[in-house]
Swiss-Prot record:
GO cellular component, one term: exodeoxyribonuclease VII complex
Role description: Bidirectionally degrades single-stranded DNA into large acid-insoluble oligonucleotides, which are then degraded further into small acid-soluble oligonucleotides.
Record text on subunit structure and interactions: Heterooligomer composed of large and small subunits.
Source lineage: Bacteria, Pseudomonadati, Pseudomonadota, Gammaproteobacteria, Oceanospirillales
GO terms assigned for molecular function: exodeoxyribonuclease VII activity; nucleic acid binding
Top-tier EC class: hydrolase
Family: Belongs to the XseA family.
EC number: 3.1.11.6
InterPro entries: Exonuc_VII_L, Exonuc_VII_lsu_C, OB-fold_nuc-bd_dom
Xref: CDD domains: ExoVII_LU_OBF
Name the record gives this protein: Exodeoxyribonuclease 7 large subunit
Biological source species: Alcanivorax borkumensis (strain ATCC 700651 / DSM 11573 / NCIMB 13689 / SK2)
């Protein structure tokens, strides 16, 4: 407190500041109950009012950052319970309270009743997370349990129409406020379960006071919601409001509009996901096609056709024939080399008779010596001709030319009916083309 004297008197501002500090330090937060009067809401968003009883009154203020959290609209003449601090408005020297919280008088008893019932149901495991069901990603039909004439149903339908207009919505009407509301809400929920028409349900209403929302704190309704076999979203009041059905439901939404968003797929997001999946599918198909084409190319390079096999066999036969001719020529050259010394020795003999005999013998030897070689050559030529004929006879193309055919299932030749079943596609190769056929019936020959 500022010290003053006649020589140094206090200013009015300083006095009010000292009084404000004294009040705020002397009184903690207090609870007051009284009747609202002179209630005003200027453009600033702050509230100003008087709080009175039968014998006195006090001015009060509740600033915008606090009053925006309330779930009811105060009116003149209402009995309210406030939590406030005592202060002094320095510019005018007005003694007043600054309210931090306000609720209708009598709400405290309801709150205590709510807390007790919540604790009981929670102890029974009614709100356990393991009992919660997952909402369907794409429901075939959505059910809404609420008043058919309230703001909540309009908000829900507006959101559903925007996000997924193709999904039908079924409304189960019920009162959401008053003495009849709990029973009607239970009946509507029981009807939705009995008819089993919807894949997901929304239970909710717009905002209001604790008394207005009390129907959603009904014990029977909370138990019915917890035991509902259909996934259910509770959307009672605004974000600051909480009812027992919010804890019992599979999911709580802060507002009815938010509940509609939770139960409905967003078509724009679904379209984006489908487009992404389509691109992914095309990429995978292209990769698979390239893999198959590469395998086919590799297999086609390894596959040897009958014509290629015959050409390679003919080339091998030509090589063998050339080798045989070279061997025969080499043998003949060797024999001629062996004959030449004999001719030289014969030329050195002088008697005419010996010369004639030797010439005759030489002529005889000259005729006899090539005969084994010629016979061996003829035998090898005959053997070569036989091999060529056998190779030509064994050629698949020659077999086809004689009127036969070869049937394939895929790349495998069909040798038995046990390889086939009805519906198989076969390729039959003839000498001048192919036939594509499908198996209609398979009959095994009776070999007994």
């Amino acid at each position: 407190m500022t010290i003053s004297s006649r020589a140094e008197p206090l200013s009015i501002s300083q006095l009010n500041l000292d009084a404000q500090g004294l009040l705020e330090s002397s009184f903690p937060l207090i609870w007051l109950q009284g009747e609202l009067s002179n209630f005003s809401r200027p453009a600033s968003g702050h509230w100003y009012f008087s709080l009175k009883d039968t014998r006195a009154q006090i001015n009060g203020a509740m600033f915008r950052n606090r009053n925006r959290l309330l779930n009811f609209a105060p009116q003149n003449g209402e009995q309210v319970l406030v939590r406030a601090k005592i202060t002094l408005y320095v510019p005018r020297g007005n003694f007043q309270i600054v309210v931090e919280h306000m609720e209708p008088a009598g709400q405290g008893a309801l709150k205590a009743q709510f807390d007790a019932l919540k604790a009981q149901l929670q102890s029974e495991g009614l709100f356990a997370q393991e009992h919660k069901r997952t909402l369907p990603a794409w429901p075939n039909q959505i059910g809404v349990i609420t008043s058919p004439s309230g703001a909540a149903i309009r908000d829900i339908l507006q959101v559903l129409q925007r996000r997924c207009p193709s999904i039908p919505v079924l409304i189960y009407p019920a009162a959401v406020q008053g003495a009849e509301a709990p029973a009607q809400l239970r009946q509507a929920l029981a009807l939705a379960v009995a008819r089993n028409e919807c894949d997901v349900l929304i239970l909710g209403r717009g905002g209001g006071s604790l008394e207005d929302l009390w129907a959603f704190n009904d014990e029977g309704l909370a138990r019915a919601v917890a035991n509902c076999p259909i996934p259910i979203v509770s959307a009672v009041g605004h974000e600051v409001d909480t009812g027992l059905t919010d804890f019992a439901a599979d999911l709580r939404a802060p507002t009815p509009s938010a509940a509609a968003e939770l139960v409905s797929p967003d078509l724009s997001i679904v379209s984006q996901r489908l487009a992404g999946l389509h691109r992914r599918l095309r990429w995978v198909m292209a990769q698979e096609l390239r893999t198959v084409q590469e395998r086919l190319r590799h297999l086609s390079q390894r596959l040897r056709s009958p014509r290629q096999h015959l050409e390679q066999s003919s080339q091998r036969l030509d090589e063998l024939q050339n080798r045989l001719q070279r061997q025969m020529q080499h043998r003949l050259t060797l024999l001629q080399g062996r004959l030449q010394p004999s001719q030289q020795r014969l030329a050195r003999l002088s008697p005419q008779r010996l010369l004639v005999e030797r010439q005759q013998r030489l002529a005889t030897l000259s005729k006899r010596l090539p005969q084994p070689i010629l016979r061996q050559l003829q035998q090898q030529q005959l053997q070569l001709a036989g091999l060529s004929k056998r190779l030509h006879t064994a050629s698949p193309l020659e077999t086809l030319a004689r009127g036969y055919s070869i049937t394939f299932k895929g790349n495998q030749a069909v040798r038995s009916v046990e390889q086939l079943q009805a519906g198989d596609t076969l390729t039959t190769r003839l000498a001048d083309g192919e036939i594509i056929a499908r198996v209609e019936h398979v009959q095994v020959s009776d070999t007994d």
